[in-house]
Amino acid sequence: MAQIKITLTKSPIGRKPEQRKTVVALGLGKLNSSVVKEDNAAIRGMVNAISHLVTVEEA
């Protein structure tokens, strides 16, 4: 299955608690940290919820 690389580019400070929890659930910590996840509907939904904080590219 395809994979995507998710990079945290903006800080979740001052964002809604749901968005901050989504950042943590994806495994992102500090700015510019990246994770590689499977490209499925659940991950895409999480990324869509915080699309203004992250960049996504094919891994």
Swiss-Prot record:
Gene Ontology terms describing biological process: translation
One GO term describing the cellular component: cytosolic large ribosomal subunit
Gene3D superfamilies recorded: Ribosomal protein L30, ferredoxin-like fold domain
PROSITE patterns in UniProt: RIBOSOMAL_L30
Complex formation: Part of the 50S ribosomal subunit.
Family: Belongs to the universal ribosomal protein uL30 family.
Protein name (database record): Large ribosomal subunit protein uL30
Taxonomic source organism: Streptococcus agalactiae serotype V (strain ATCC BAA-611 / 2603 V/R)
Gene this chain is encoded by: rpmD
